[in-house]
Curated annotation (Swiss-Prot):
Residues 1-52 form a transit peptide. Residues 143-270 form the Fatty acid hydroxylase domain. It is a multi-pass membrane protein. Keywords: Carotenoid biosynthesis, Chloroplast, Hydrolase, Iron, Membrane, Metal-binding, NAD, Oxidoreductase, Plastid, Transit peptide, Transmembrane, Transmembrane helix. It comes from Arabidopsis thaliana. This is Beta-carotene 3-hydroxylase 2, chloroplastic. The gene is BETA-OHASE 2.
Length: 303
């Protein structure tokens, strides 16, 4: 509400001389000295008229509260969405973590059971061949270690050379769940399946060695999948293995391979940090490790 001064009226009325005459002299006692006139003067009467007008005017406080109220509502809505997103992300991570752990234990348990039934079935009714058992376990370890050197050689001599047309998909942003480079995982799985099949259904030292070799290739492939596809390229959550110091170092070394700072080195995976240090990339490796630690901590704090 505001009162506006809309009209000011001023009226000037002349003094009526007819009311005064010589017959009626003005007594000086009637008026005080301050109001005595020397002769007749015109008397001015000032009339001021005020018209009060109501104006509809919003309070400044109301105007200020409107944007604050709007901002507050948007902030509350945004905070609510962020909380829901964080809760959903936390739930998904926990689910994937359980799935990763259960699948790891599942595959490992199946491998142990296959070894147990292979020997119990093959040796049923006879003596256990210590040599065959030792050969199976030795070949499983040897095949797993040998696959690291095979992967290093094939990566450098084949995938980055004659088979680059297929492997190039791995060095480009992936579109979809799969890439052409995944064919190499299938080609490595075929001999492992063949060796396991032959070794499981046949008796003797040679079938035992084949079974061990197939088992070693399988275990290497499973470890490669979790570290390379999961930890390095984040194709799926890997859970607590992301915080294992050496595996973090392995992931950092492989990340340098994709930056091409040392002419593609390292070409191996699990021995990649050693390759990087041999070409003088220890400092760059430490920087990449620090970067990954910061990213991991940031992701953990926001989850």
């Amino acid at each position: 509400m505001a009162a506006g001064l809309s009209t000011i009226a001023v009226t000037l009325k002349p003094l009526n001389r007819s009311s005064f005459s010589a017959n009626h002299p003005i007594s000086t006692a009637v008026f005080p000295p301050s109001l005595r006139f020397n002769g007749f003067r015109r008397r001015k009467i000032l009339t001021v008229c005020f018209v009060v007008e109501e104006r509809k005017q919003s309070s400044p406080m109301d105007d200020d509260n409107k944007p604050e109220s709007t901002t507050s509502s948007s902030e509350i809505l945004m905070t609510s969405r962020l909380l829901k997103k964080a809760e959903k992300k936390k739930s998904e991570r926990f689910t994937y973590l359980i799935a990763a752990v259960m699948s790891s234990f599942g595959i490992t348990s199946m491998a142990i059971m296959a070894v147990y039934y292979r020997f119990s079935w093959q040796m049923k009714g006879g003596e256990v061949s210590v040599l065959e058992m030792f050969g199976t376990f030795a070949l499983s370890v040897g095949a797993a270690v040998g696959m690291e050197f095979w992967a290093r050689w094939a990566h450098r001599a084949l995938w980055h050379d004659s088979l680059w047309n297929m492997h190039e998909s791995h060095h480009k942003p992936r579109e979809g769940a799969f890439e052409l480079n995944d064919v190499f995982a299938i080609t490595n799985a075929v001999p492992a399946i063949g060796l396991l099949y032959y070794g499981f259904l046949n008796k003797g030292l040679v079938p035992g060695l084949c079974f061990g070799a197939g088992l070693g290739i399988t275990m290497f492939g499973m470890a490669y999948m979790f570290v390379h596809d999961g930890l390095v390229h984040k194709r799926f959550p890997v859970g607590p293995i992301a915080n294992v110091p050496y595996l973090r170092k392995v992931a950092a070394a492989h990340q340098l391979h994709h930056t091409d700072k040392f002419k593609g080195v390292p070409y191996g995976l699990f021995l990649g940090p050693k390759e990087v240090e041999e070409v003088g990339g220890k400092e760059e490796l430490e920087k990449e490790i620090s970067r990954r630690i910061k990213l991991y901590n940031k992701g953990s704090s926001t989850s």
